[in-house]
């Protein structure tokens, strides 16, 4: 099974990816992980990618496509398929992906953006152990139930930054949603449900 997972920051994509790769026994292909392993292994394409990252520049589409292509050509993906996360990010990447891999389904976890904003800006993390909480369930507590550490809001979880991230995501992703909808591959799932309900809906629609 060859599946792409789409979802805005805070939509629970990572949680669903973990559950899906367990159920369907397919490798979870995250572009961030592939970049890190290529850079760490100092592969020619990893060295190329690092040269852009070190300058604070975006890695060109052609380099990203090549890194993903190499990973999808490995034995585990050839045998079992994949769950692709973080790629494609634009139409060029989607069209290139279609040239070397048959994408079967594209799962879009759709979440009400105002609820998403509340979910992310209300997030608090323990400064010591990293445990995550939400202000709605803290009842005014300011310390971690696990280790007693101070609960803080991440610098990039403020309303202005989150709002910008969501706007960029929507602008980038809507053309992809349209692209895969036209191809008859799009599955839209209601991400405002509980984790288990979202998972059940994805599995039902994947068949």
Model regions and ranges:
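P-loop (Walker A) phosphate-binding loop of NTP-binding proteins
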Residues: 8
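ATP-dependent small-molecule kinase phosphotransfer cores
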Residues: 27-102, 125, 154, 199
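NTP-dependent small-molecule kinase module
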Residues: 150-207
């Amino acid at each position: 099974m060859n599946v792409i997972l789409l979802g805005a920051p805070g939509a629970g994509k990572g949680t669903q990816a973990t559950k899906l790769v367990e159920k369907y026994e397919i490798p979870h292909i995250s572009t961030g992980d592939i970049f890190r392993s290529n850079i760490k292994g100092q592969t020619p394409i990893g060295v190329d990618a690092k040269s852009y990252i070190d300058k604070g520049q975006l890695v060109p589409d052609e380099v990203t496509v090549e890194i993903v292509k190499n990973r999808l050509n490995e034995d585990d993906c050839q045998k079992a398929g994949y769950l692709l996360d973080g790629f494609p990010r634009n139409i060029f990447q989607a069209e290139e992906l279609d040239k070397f891999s048959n994408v079967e389904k594209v799962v879009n976890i759709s979440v009400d953006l105002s609820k998403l904003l509340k979910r992310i800006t209300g997030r608090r993390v323990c400064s010591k152990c990293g445990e995550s909480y939400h202000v709605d369930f803290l009842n005014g507590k300011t310390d971690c139930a696990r280790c007693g550490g101070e609960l803080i809001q991440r610098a990039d979880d403020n309303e202005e930054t989150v709002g910008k991230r969501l706007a960029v995501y929507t602008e980038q992703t809507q053309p992809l949603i349209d692209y895969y909808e036209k191809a008859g591959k799009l599955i839209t799932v209601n991400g405002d449900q509980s984790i288990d309900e979202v998972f059940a809906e994805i599995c039902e629609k994947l068949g």
